[in-house]
Amino acid sequence: MSARTVKLAVIPGDGIGPEVVAEGLKVLSAVAPRHGLTLDTTEYELGAQRWHATGEVLPDAVEEELRQHDAILLGAVGDPTVPSGVLERGLLLRLRFNFSHYVNLRPVRLYPGVTTPLAGVAPEDIDMLVVREGTEGPYAGMGGVLRKGTPHEIATQDSVNTRLGVERVVRYAFAKAAERPCHKLTLVHKDNVLTYAGELWQRVVREVGAEYPQVEVDYLHVDAATMFFVTQPRRFDVVVTDNLFGDIITDLGAAVAGGIGLAASGNINPEGDFPSMFEPVHGSAPDIAGQGKADPTATILSVSLMLEHLGYADAAAQIDQAVAEDLQERAKNGGVRSTTQIGDDIAQRVAEQG
């Protein structure tokens, strides 16, 4: 691509977030000049520290500033000193909803040299892309409580599924399936119980699928899908599912592909009306924060996803190759490296590529 300046908002966040983000930026800085890419980064202090100091999670003015960027790189959000849900809903979900991040993209890939808990599984057996709907379902926040504190208390949490919301994420998933060699898409839901939502998803997949005759389509109940993630991971190529089911099966996917320390994600607005946000899926791990023990690989792979989204597929491929080489080296030689050492090694591999 031609020379370009990318405005990148950086949210290190809580716990190990600042440490892993620093290594992601290190690798990004190593690959960017090779592709005519100039970085204009702005760091935002959003997370537990800000909440304790001001009582705010994401001020409106800061949200407006974030809106002006091309992409957002997030480290981790969460702290035991903050009530559960305050940071998650106030920052993560707010950005997903307000920036229309209706695609949550989660690659599930077993790299050579990485250990999986599954017996008899090779790297070529686990290479899938989970496309999770990101702005609807039970996460929409609709519901309520009646007769709270009484023996007759009732709590409801509604799952919202709109035609618009389902169709746009299904279209994205079909487009991805059409690009990949296997040309296969699996819808995961629970339509035998969630009959109204399930029927909508099934109908939309059938209708959109008619536009992609080259893509093979199948369906699995979510409980069956979890079983096949473990027993037959090779049957999956692109998986499309709703917000809740996607949240669950992607963590299972991370586990079978070597652990959550290698799991990258993108919260994507495909049209580019808002900046997409990229983050490792692991938590803030406050128990090891500041000790140099955190593996930054998931953040580095999230940077790769970001570059691919921005149109720099070659740069993304260079990072993927460097990570794959580093993981093979780990398997061969073992040893313990610090967070910064892993970042240094991967950045050096990127710089040395021809």
Curated annotation (Swiss-Prot):
Pfam families: Iso_dh. The keyword tRNA processing does not apply. The record marks 139, 190 as: Important for catalysis. Its cofactor is Mg(2+); Mn(2+). GO terms for molecular function: 3-isopropylmalate dehydrogenase activity; magnesium ion binding; NAD binding. It is an enzyme of class 1 (oxidoreductase). NAD(+) binds at residues 283-295. Signal peptide: none annotated. The keyword Oxidoreductase applies. Its main location: cytoplasm. InterPro entries: ICDH/IPMDH (IPR050501), IsoCit/isopropylmalate_DH_CS (IPR019818), IsoPropMal-DH-like_dom (IPR024084), LeuB_actb (IPR023698). Its EC number is 1.1.1.85. Catalyzes the oxidation of 3-carboxy-2-hydroxy-4-methylpentanoate (3-isopropylmalate) to 3-carboxy-4-methyl-2-oxopentanoate. The product decarboxylates to 4-methyl-2 oxopentanoate. Homodimer. This is 3-isopropylmalate dehydrogenase. The gene is leuB.
